[in-house]
Amino acid sequence: MKEGIHPKNYRPVVFQDLSNGDKFIVRSCIVTSETIKMEDGHEYPLSKVEITNASHPFFTGQQMLLDTAGRVERFNKRFGKMGKKS
């Protein structure tokens, strides 16, 4: 590996999901002012984030799918004849 091109502050950081409280330890260069003591006894820099894969509806399976096919059919039934020439 080339020397001098990698960040000096690449270290383990705790990312805390504010919506459900989950915590993840990930290596990062993010600059933080807060720290947190984890269960392993070490103190890590803390970064609070609004949403993660632990709380995002796409990843948790709570995603709502909208049925747009009915709306398109209703639109075409109402206005589909307007664009056609007789």
From Swiss-Prot:
Gene3D superfamilies: Ribosomal protein L31 (4.10.830.30). The keyword DNA repair does not apply. Signal peptide: none annotated. Pfam families: Ribosomal_L31 (PF01197). One of its GO terms (biological process) is translation. GO terms for molecular function: structural constituent of ribosome. PROSITE patterns: RIBOSOMAL_L31. Keywords: Ribonucleoprotein, Ribosomal protein. InterPro entries: Ribosomal_bL28/bL31-like_sf, Ribosomal_bL31, Ribosomal_bL31_B, Ribosomal_bL31_sf. One of its GO terms (cellular component) is ribosome. Part of the 50S ribosomal subunit. Belongs to the bacterial ribosomal protein bL31 family. Type B subfamily. This is Large ribosomal subunit protein bL31B. It comes from Chloroherpeton thalassium (strain ATCC 35110 / GB-78).
